[in-house]
Amino acid sequence: MNIFLVVAANGKAGQKIVTELMARGLDVTVAVRQANKTQASQVIIKDLFDLTAADVSNFDVVIDAFGAWAPEALPQHTSSLEHLAAILAPNARLLVVGGAGSLYLDASHTAALKDSDGFPEAFKPLASAMGEGLARLRTLDVDWTYLSPAADFVADGEKKGHYVIEGEVLTTDDKGVSQLSYADYATAVVDIATSGRYHRERVSVRW
């Protein structure tokens, strides 16, 4: 059975992922900077950038739920991935909680959601930083999977118990809506983490 580490687990997505892992009876440890807010009892209290190879050596799957929003911290969306890739055990998987802004608008892969007219200006710096992190991740020597949520990512939305996995292009349901709850996103993350699918690949998740 795989042993899981959720990094930056105190955030909303991180907590949902931990809850889903534990509901399945899986072996879960969390890495958090401050007091643990998750259901997990196995805890490493350390900043992501202070984690060492020894800290993560026993984990088969590391789920990175790190996020940074302050302008001065946005480059950490790249440096955090570089750090984790450098310290993970040779055969470990790295699953990254990603963003929707870098999803492409069509199969040409020339323009992303963040470049579209309706994308909120306030979120463009974050979306760009996360896109740069993904671009760097593609070059790193690590077994990664990057999971982009739907354009409308609903923190407190209901758990419907279903989702659709798509590729690098933003897709919608039959009503033209790209939406997903954090709860169903967490289910998708854990399903992928336990399935061994989508190696060195970015996928998108929506209802």
Predicted regions and their residues:
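N-terminal Rossmann NAD(P)H-binding glycine-rich loop of SDR-like oxidoreductase domains
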Residues: 2-24
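Conserved Rossmann-fold NAD(P)-dependent oxidoreductase catalytic core, especially the SDR/UDP-sugar
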Residues: 29, 83-125
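Short, polar loop motifs at secondary-structure junctions
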Residues: 30-37, 151
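NAD(P)H-binding glycine-rich loop region in Rossmannoid oxidoreductase-like domains
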Residues: 36-91
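Substrate-positioning beta->alpha
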Residues: 129, 176-190, 201
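Conserved beta-loop-beta element that borders a ligand/cofactor-binding pocket
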Residues: 135-155
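Glycine/proline-rich active-site loop of Rossmann-fold NAD(P)-dependent oxidoreductases
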Residues: 140, 154-162, 192-201
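A conserved pocket-lining segment of Rossmann-fold NAD(P)-dependent short-chain dehydrogenase/reductase
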Residues: 163-180
